[in-house]
Design a protein with these regions (language model features):
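Class I SAM-dependent methyltransferase SAM/SAH-binding core
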Residues: 68-113
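A short glycine-rich, Lys/Arg-flanked "PGG" loop and its adjoining helix->strand segment in the class I
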Residues: 137-150
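Conserved class I S-adenosyl-L-methionine
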Residues: 2-56, 58-67, 152-174
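A C-terminal cap/extension of S-adenosyl-L-methionine-dependent methyltransferases
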Residues: 169, 203-255
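Acceptor-substrate binding/catalytic loop of class I
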Residues: 172-189
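A conserved beta-strand element that flanks and buttresses the S-adenosyl-L-methionine
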Residues: 125
Length: 255
């Protein structure tokens, strides 16, 4: 798989951004069960919370496509005011433990044309959506529009073991069963999209050097931690790790 231009960049009208229906499903959640899956989510949550720690207490966060409930619960527990927006009511199912208690709001909207005024939320998060987006540059632009301060999202980098993703796809399908092909990105593509939205990438957190499918295949969290620790210390993960979590901040006047 190679980085490709945004397939929907020239015409976003009428495009249905509904990949979050799949990532909000119970079927998708099974990928993250067991020790390795929990470890994946622990790394993701830890990095995300560190990237957002400059926000004031009680800051408002919009989690776009977050019906997978992979980050909203951690944001809620950290004291943020969280709204999750999804493309369909079915995306709210996994959030019920929080929405039914009033700890989180869920709203349905067109994710390519969010129904919020400019700068409505202190920060916006978006996980598991970009590589399946019908118009990824349009999605980033919309995240930037409604964010007052920061946008945090993840993406699979081509500057990583993902360069072998086409060869590993059959193994990935055999292990995950419901896997889909996905877009890969260069860091420059992501930086450019944020620049066009009036933001600048300030921090990047590559997560794993080895492909996640190999960790799932090994199915041993302690072994995965052991394998990733030395390459992280050597700085290899920083250069060649994926997925990458980035935080982009709104440009100030004159910046």
């Amino acid at each position: 798989m190679t980085p490709r231009p945004d397939p929907g960049a020239s015409n976003r009208s009428g495009l249905a951004e509904d990949a979050d229906i799949g990532t909000s499903s119970e079927d998708y959640a099974r990928r993250f069960r067991g020790g390795v899956g929990r470890w994946f989510l622990e790394i993701q949550a830890r990095n995300t919370l560190k990237l957002l720690r400059e926000l004031p207490a009680g800051a408002s966060i919009l989690d776009v496509g977050g019906g997978h409930a992979q980050i909203a619960p951690q944001l809620i527990d950290a004291g943020y005011e969280v709204t999750v927006v999804g493309s369909d009511p079915v995306c709210a199912v996994r959030l019920a433990p929080w929405t039914t208690k009033g700890r989180c709001r869920f709203e349905v909207a067109n994710l390519q044309a969010l129904p919020y005024a400019d700068r409505s939320f202190d920060a916006v998060t978006c996980f598991r959506l970009l590589p399946h987006s019908v118009s990824w540059s349009g999605l980033i632009g919309e995240l930037c529009r409604v964010a007052r301060r920061s946008v945090v999202l993840d993406y699979p980098s081509i500057r990583s073991a993902n360069i072998l993703s086409s060869r590993l796809f059959q193994l990935k399908r055999a292990i995950e069963l419901n896997t889909r092909e996905f877009l890969l990105f260069t860091p420059s593509q992501i930086h450019t999209a944020f620049t066009e939205g009036g933001f600048i990438v300030r921090k990047e957190r590559p997560q794993f050097l080895l492909p996640m499918v190999l960790h799932r295949w090994g199915n041993h969290a302690a072994l995965s931690r052991f394998a990733e620790a030395p390459v992280r210390l050597l700085g290899l993960t920083r250069w060649f790790g994926s997925p990458i979590i980035v935080r982009a901040d709104r440009r100030t006047a004159g910046a």
